[in-house]
Amino acid sequence: MDIAGKNREQWLAAYPLLQQIVLTKEVWWANPNRQPASEGLARLSLKEEDVKEAEQRLRRFAPYIASVFPETKGAGGLIESPLIDIPTMKHKLDQRFGQNVPGRLLLKGDHALPISGSIKARGGIYEVLKHAESLLVDQQILTKQDDYSLIATDAVQSFFSSYAIVVGSTGNLGLSIGIISAKLGFRVTVHMSDDAKQWKKDMLREKGVRVVEHSADYSKAVEEGRKESDADPNSYFIDDEHSIDLFVGYAVAAFRLKEQLQEKGIAVTKDQPLHVYLPCGVGGGPGGVAFGLKLVFGDAVRCFFAEPTHSPCMLIGMLTGKHQHISVQDFGIDNQTAADGLAVGRPSGFVGRMMAPLLEGIYTIADPMLYTLLADLADAEGLYLEPSAVAGLYGPVQLEKRGLYTDAATHLVWATGGSMVPKEIMETDYQLGVNLRTEQ
């Protein structure tokens, strides 16, 4: 069978690491194409001004967000998450893996982001707000100098009701886009893949979102969503595989993180680097954050992606250089994982190419380890995440194993989701982790 110009045996011979990947083993890949940040960033079409523009837009919308989502009032309508020290978890990791990773371990709490409880509240909500603003400005309902809390009026909601928003999702992107679009007054449809969790579908329907379920994976859900949207001139399709707006929405996080690190007195320099571990699905969220981090910290930050052993799409795409032209299914990998947000078989080529000169590396993690770390974190720090969100905790362990850490480094695990998970499902996930721990 031809896979992007070669047969399976030729690919395995050309890239020996693929032999382990197709057996769904945990692997580590160091990116051979990484360049100094200044060179890598200079190659890219997106610039710092694009991210600054996104930040300004989010500030314009802050009065509206504060008025319709009371949980954001304390932050003045900005959608932001805490930066949390997790020293007890660091001790637990050292114990579990017989290591002693030097440096401080922090968790970026995007599991607690208001509105939709995941990293997708950054890019997803931003792109919907940008689209809403362009419609309002084009129709002269609003100017960029106005108080955006005016958007909460019935008249504006009525205006938006003649427009539709469509997205394909494994879960969390659909939640963020569904919630904000419905709140604004848009007609919104989320096409969900077969691995999307039932509670996410239920929550969307409760908020008035139309959910279309597919018996295929993420790529098919996106394809069907795009088809539906293309048939309606008043419909706007949010494309997780190619969206620049999603990407810059995520990148804003890096500029806010800089302030949070300063507040904690944490320096980020080449001698005191920041290692950031980001769970990766199709790539938009971690890619956008990594891009922002490179803009802010340059070579003083090292970004790593974490993928499930059964859904290593970005790893295969970047390793082979074939990006979106190759999928995990091409190699007989089933794309079945409890980390539903990461259950993607084909990566974003846009993100893979953006990351080629910037990303330090990618590692994979098996589902049993995700559940084990989920239970460990709950016990150590009282923080409850969904399985995909703990993938970053495995990063410092992988670095130590290979002697790649620096004694003065700060380790930052990006917790991508969890606060919206129903209590009984979280309890089941936790118990599974406890049971797996006992068996190990």
Swiss-Prot record:
Gene3D superfamilies hit by this protein: 3.40.50.1100
Cofactor requirement: pyridoxal 5'-phosphate
EC code(s) of this entry: 4.3.1.18
Database matches in Pfam families: PALP
Domain of life: Bacteria
Entry-annotated residues carrying N6-(pyridoxal phosphate)lysine: 120
One BP term from GO: D-serine catabolic process
Catalytic activity: D-serine = pyruvate + NH4(+)
Principal EC category: lyase
A GO molecular-function descriptor: D-serine ammonia-lyase activity
Keywords of the record: Lyase, Pyridoxal phosphate
Family classification: Belongs to the serine/threonine dehydratase family. DsdA subfamily.
Family matches, as NCBIfam families: D_Ser_am_lyase, PRK02991.1
PANTHER family recorded: D-SERINE DEHYDRATASE (PTHR48078:SF9), THREONINE DEHYDRATASE, MITOCHONDRIAL-RELATED (PTHR48078)
Name assigned to this protein: Probable D-serine dehydratase
Species in which this protein is naturally found: Shouchella clausii (strain KSM-K16)
Origin organism lineage: Bacteria, Bacillati, Bacillota, Bacilli, Bacillales
